[in-house]
C-alpha cells in the first residue's frame, strides 16, 4: 500500500477499535441508569440523528477545506464524547454524549471520500475492501478489549476507547497527507446537494438501497447485546468476545474474499449475494434457541456484511465524480445515518414489545426486499461524465 493508504487505514483502524469498545458495552452501561430497551434504541438513534444533521455539512466542508482537518475535528469530538460517557451520572448525560459524538462524527464519511480521491475504477473495490478490513479488525480488537476491561468496571473500557481515539487523532494530525486543494470551493447547501444528487436516476435507487441496508444493519448491531442477554444469558464481557469473533470472520471475508468475488460477480451481484447471506444469518438467529446453531449462523451473517459494506460503498463512490466525492459520501452518509436512526428504534422497540426473534426476523425480511431492489439497479459508469457536466 502507498503511504496515504497506510495512514488512513491505521487512523480508521484505531478509531474503530475505540468505537468497537463502546458498542457491546453501551446497552449494559445504559441499563445501570435505568434505561429500557426502547431508551437504549433511542440512545443509539440520538447519535445517528445528530450525524444525519452534520454529515452532509462535514462532507461539503471536506471538499472545501480538505479531508484531514475534518477528520481531526471528528476524532476530537469522539474523544470529548467518550470522556462525557465515562463521567456520566445520569441517562441524560449519556444522550448528550452520544449527540456530541454524532454532530462531530464525520470520520468514516471523510475516510470514504479520502479513498475515493485516490482510487481508480480498477482498484476502487479493493481499496474499499481494505476499509472494510479496518472495520473488521476494529471489531475484533475493540470488543475484545471491551470484554477484558469490563471485568474492571463499565467505565474502564470507555476510558480505554478515549485514549485509543487520541492516538487516531495524532496519526491524522502528523502523518496523514492531504488529497484535495482548497480551490473552486462553491458555497452550496449540503441539503441542496443531497436533493440534486438524489435527482440523478443512477443515485436515487442506490441511495434507497443504502438506506434500507443500514437501517436493517442497525437493528442487528444495536439489539445484539440485548438479544444474546435475553436468549443466552450473556453479559457485557461475553458479548464483547462474541463481537470480536464476528469481527474476525468479517476480516477474513473482506480481506481475502471480497476482491476475487467482486472481480468475478461485479459489485451489484456481490451486494445482492451479501444481502441474501445476511438475511439467512439474521433470520436463522431469530428462529433458533440453540447457542451452537447461533454461532454457526454468524458465518452467513459475516459473509453478508463482508460482501455488502465494500460493494455498496464502492457503488456509491463510482456513481459520483472524483471532484465531488465529499458531497456524494456526505449525502450517502446522511441517508445511512437516517437508516441508523430508524433502525435502533425499530429493532429495540420490536424487541421490547414483541421479542428479540421478531426484531431479527423483521430485519431479515427487509434485507430480502433490498436484494430485490438491487436486482433493478443498473450500474452505469456514465455518472462520471454526468457529474463533470
Kindly give the residue locations of the regions a language model identified.
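Short amphipathic helix-loop junctions that connect adjacent transmembrane helices
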Residues: 24-37, 222-238
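Cytoplasmic helix-loop-helix junction between adjacent transmembrane helices
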Residues: 97-136
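Helix-to-loop junctions at the C-terminal end of transmembrane segments
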Residues: 55-66, 253-267, 351
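Juxtamembrane intracellular "pre-TM" segments in multi-pass secondary transporters
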Residues: 177-209
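Helix-loop-helix hairpin linking two adjacent transmembrane segments in secondary transporters
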Residues: 131-173
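Intracellular juxtamembrane helix-capping segments at the cytosolic ends
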Residues: 107-119, 307-320
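Helix-breaking motifs and short loop linkers at transmembrane-helix boundaries and internal kinks
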Residues: 34, 66, 87-92, 233, ...
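Structural signature of the two symmetry-related core transmembrane helices
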Residues: 69-84, 269-284
